[in-house]
């Protein structure tokens, strides 16, 4: 199997895993921290907003089965791409959305997707999700991995209570909500 990586941030990483897990060609989705200047940060360190990291997921995928463009289609249906100050009731640097590109193809695909979404006028405000070069990724602690499976009741309550589920459904219907 050929494999590539997509590293994407969209607020709380708990909500960024489930939409990707059953999609063909996706081999794994790992919650973690990306983009910062501290090696192997902990959740507590990242939450201080002093490490430069954002909560993110790293997706391993088979490019012969699915494309980075398909992953972006899913990604943009999981968060509010018009808010760069955090997501829903999670505010601050560690919850900012970011696309971390691994190569020029991913960079161009991300730029095109942002432009396409802005032209389609799906959102009332412009899509402003930053596109940055991939720097690093550190897996989060075990209790954060597959959170939606380990804590389904809390996961569902979090999605509803934060406003994420309502936002996604208002823009995309029940897709990925």
From Swiss-Prot:
InterPro entries: Met_Sox_Rdtase_MsrA_dom, Met_Sox_Rdtase_MsrA_sf
Name listed for the protein in its UniProt record: Peptide methionine sulfoxide reductase MsrA 2
Species: Staphylococcus aureus (strain Mu50 / ATCC 700699)
Active site: 12
Molecular function in Gene Ontology: L-methionine:thioredoxin-disulfide S-oxidoreductase activity; peptide-methionine (S)-S-oxide reductase activity
Keyword Ligase: no
Gene3D superfamilies, per the entry: Peptide methionine sulphoxide reductase MsrA
Protein task: Has an important function as a repair enzyme for proteins that have been inactivated by oxidation. Catalyzes the reversible oxidation-reduction of methionine sulfoxide in proteins to methionine.
Highest taxon in the source lineage: Bacteria
Name of the gene: msrA2
Pfam families associated with the record: PMSR (PF01625)
Alphabetical GO biological process terms: protein modification process
Catalysed conversion reaction: L-methionyl-[protein] + [thioredoxin]-disulfide + H2O = L-methionyl-(S)-S-oxide-[protein] + [thioredoxin]-dithiol; [thioredoxin]-disulfide + L-methionine + H2O = L-methionine (S)-S-oxide + [thioredoxin]-dithiol
Family membership: Belongs to the MsrA Met sulfoxide reductase family.
EC number(s) on file: 1.8.4.11
Phylogenetic classification of the source organism: Bacteria, Bacillati, Bacillota, Bacilli, Bacillales
Key words, A-Z: Oxidoreductase
